[in-house]
Amino acid sequence: MPYHRGGDASSQADKLSGIVEESDLYEGFAPHVETSEIKTLDFYNLPKQTGKEPALRSYTEIQQLLQQGKKRDVKNILRENSWPINSPIRAQLWPMLCGQHQTKQQMLDGFYWEMVHQVFGTTELSEKPIMLPAFVDATHCLPYHLTSTGRAVADRIVNVLGYDCPDITYSPVLYPITSILLHFMSEEEAYICLAGLVGSKEKVFINQTKLQHEVTWKTVMQIAKKHTKSATSYFQRICPGLKLERIFMDWCWWILAGLPFQHLVRIMDCYFHEGIKVLYRVALVILNLFHKECQSNNEWSPDNIKNDIGNALIKFCKKIPVSPAKLLHAAFSIRGLSTQYISRIFIKTEMLLKSRSVLTSGSKQLIKSRSSDNLPTSQSQVNIQMMSHTLTIREHFGLPGTKNFIKTWTDRQFLFTLWSWLPVRITMYQPVLLYTTEEHGCSLTTFYVRVEQHEPTLLMIKTCNNEVFGAYCSSRWFERNVKDDKGQRQAYFGTGETFLFSLYPERAKYPWVGIEGDKDLGHSSELFMAADSKMITIGGGEGQAIWMDENIRFGKTDSCKTFNNPPLCPSGDFEIRVLEVYGFVGI
């Protein structure tokens, strides 16, 4: 560690003493933390102690209060005690705080490692990256200051938690919180902490479904409109066409991806006791601070931020002009933000979203899909994996707990991703393979015989170049024969629930462009499905998204107005190696 020359001998001695004791600076961190990165954050720029500050409370004191049921006293201590970022107290404090929310019986010693062995077949940490569950947001797997080993540990924890808690279907914040926990404790302790947070019934800590996630950010938006009215009005004034939704969808990343680590750690001290309402309060303070800076700092002038306020907010958080203590003080000084008030808005927002599950566009009624709310049941996973040729799963099939599980994981990611895109009601049914070119031949006639009466159907294409893509088709293929009042067959049929997807090499879903209820769409944006004796096509309007010939051998893919998709394979033209079509039993 560099130090300054000059000064008196005692000053130099103090500095040298600091060098000798440098290792003590890191005693609060777990072994899988890159401490050299953290050194530059806070240690040598701490505010000088005036001697008037009360002594920081100890773990034992807090433990006694918690055992006595004095949660309010604990809350006040956590809010007011600014333990340094490297304080060893968190290694004991955080597990205790998270553990109080555990509703299940206390985990037996070794339970986590038994789960690891059941899922991976070994407790050794793999040197190769492992595929994360579908509920993880791959763009926000924030490691903070974890080493590569620490990141692998975080990956493993999240996988085991996903296996143990199959009800978790969408939880983008779970990975970052896992990473934060691992800075101060062991792998097993971090897992137990997460299990406590996820299993909490009294307070909400981590959203676990797409619906909860959406209700939460909309709740934050509603609260902000009241408690940070000046800020939200300012954003709309400088960007007249701006929808506030675009800003608040990323509200949690202002905190988890934007704030400096020392701020984040102090927020977690309170969050692990009080729940997600702490993050609500911090988000409101960030908005107010940003608004003030916009009016006084040229860096955040309207011209500089109006094109991307969301990104500007993240950048502002990285340079936030207040200390962790001041940030928390401001957050907990907001009046009228009780738990009851927040719950009232949350429930109202949730009911509103559920009531809008049926969208109306013109004369058509569509079921809006909360696509990530459900993943496959264990049996439906077995069924589709054992049947599928396109995903090349059958020859590697294995269940969790067998040695083959790791081999199937690369292919199972496709299954989980695809299943998460289906309308929620469809995921309740078991898939059945209706048609595959490998068993039923390459004939459009056979395709119709086996498929046309089923609704909906899922088409998956694997090309000779190994691209994998397809479509969810909401209507029966038999509708190609339905005639209008004039006795003419309709060229296109289907509904806006139809969507395209690509699984390899790109992974993406392309829903109907009108799914958000835009009433100004033209006819060319409502061309979902078409078929005759010579071809089938999905998606039209200035191009066909998927077109296949009568021999189901050759096809082409273009951009189209109905789905606003790019070509689903780079060349545009493709030769079909396998076509599979699935229906769903019991619909």
UniProtKB/Swiss-Prot annotation:
Residues 84-275 form the Rab-GAP TBC domain. InterPro entries: Rab-GAP-TBC_dom, Rab-GAP_TBC_sf, TLDc_dom. It comes from Drosophila melanogaster. Residues 408-585 form the TLDc domain. GTPase-activating protein (GAP) for Rab35 which regulates synaptic vesicle (SV) protein recycling and turnover at the neuromuscular junction boutons and possibly ventral nerve cord via endosomal trafficking. Inhibits Rab35-mediated endosomal sorting which traffics old or dysfunctional SV proteins through a degradative endolysosomal route that involves the ESCRT pathway and the HOPS complex members dor, vps39 and rab7. The Rab-GAP TBC domain is essential for phosphoinositide binding. Keywords: Cytoplasmic vesicle, Endosome, Lipid-binding, Membrane, Phosphoprotein, Synapse. Pfam families: RabGAP-TBC, TLD. Detected in the larval ventral nerve cord and neuromuscular junction boutons (at protein level). Changing G543R: In sky-1; embryonic lethal. The gene is sky. It is found in: Cytoplasmic vesicle, Secretory vesicle, Synaptic vesicle membrane; Endosome membrane. This is GTPase-activating protein skywalker. A 1,2-diacyl-sn-glycero-3-phospho-(1D-myo-inositol) binds at K75, R79, K277, R281, R335, G336, L337, S338, T339. Its main location: membrane. One of its GO terms (biological process) is synaptic vesicle recycling via endosome. It comes from the Eukaryota. Signal peptide: none annotated. GO terms for molecular function: GTPase activator activity; lipid binding. The keyword Lipid metabolism does not apply. One of its GO terms (cellular component) is endosome membrane. It is a peripheral membrane protein. Changing R79C: Loss of binding to liposomes containing phosphoinositides.
